[in-house]
């Protein structure tokens, strides 16, 4: 969706609006008011709404909506903001995960939360971020990195991404925003 919205913006056309709206409607159909999350289609039953990662659940939806926002017209902007409002409750109930990777670990969610807080910050979100930062630093200091992340060198699932996240969270602003695919 971000690619289509940016393309429409750059070409100054509404040619893709129906397609964009259709994609947003499909993703919105996967949202559950009961669970305050988007479905992970790999799972069945209640498990479908437990994902909180960049790759599945509210994390990816949040990243997509934040990436779209600068290029959206007024009508689309309202739809995006509705989803971002939904995402806030997901962030407020965020809990530590076992992994640290960008794709589905703590550092990925911290980067998304940090980006989200540029859009909408609250004392509750700051509290959650502070807790996650402290817990994540403790895990990293004690080398509690899952083997599949420790021995993987990749960006989204490995040590390159963990290093990238540490730099971003330390305030290095010159790096592209990988989580929003701003490369």
Positions of predicted regions on the chain:
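Glycan-recognition and catalytic cores of secretory/periplasmic carbohydrate-active enzymes
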Residues: 1-183
């Amino acid at each position: 969706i971000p690619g289509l919205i940016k393309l429409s913006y750059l070409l100054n056309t509404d040619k893709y609006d129906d397609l964009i709206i259709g994609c947003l409607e499909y993703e919105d159909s996967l949202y559950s008011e009961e669970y305050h999350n988007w479905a992970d289609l790999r799972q069945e039953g209640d498990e479908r709404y437990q994902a909180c990662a960049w790759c599945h659940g509210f994390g990816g939806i949040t990243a997509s909506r934040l990436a779209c926002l600068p290029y959206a017209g007024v009508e689309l902007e309202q739809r995006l903001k509705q989803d971002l409002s939904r995402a806030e409750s997901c962030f407020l109930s965020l809990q530590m995960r076992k992994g640290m990777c960008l794709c589905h670990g703590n550092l990925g969610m911290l980067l998304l939360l940090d980006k989200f807080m540029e859009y909408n910050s609250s004392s509750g979100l700051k509290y959650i971020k502070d807790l996650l930062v402290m817990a994540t630093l403790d895990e990293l200091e004690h080398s509690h990195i899952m083997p599949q992340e420790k021995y993987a060198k990749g960006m989204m699932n490995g040590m390159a991404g963990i290093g990238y996240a540490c730099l971003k969270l330390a305030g290095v602003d010159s790096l592209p925003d990988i989580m929003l695919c701003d490369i």
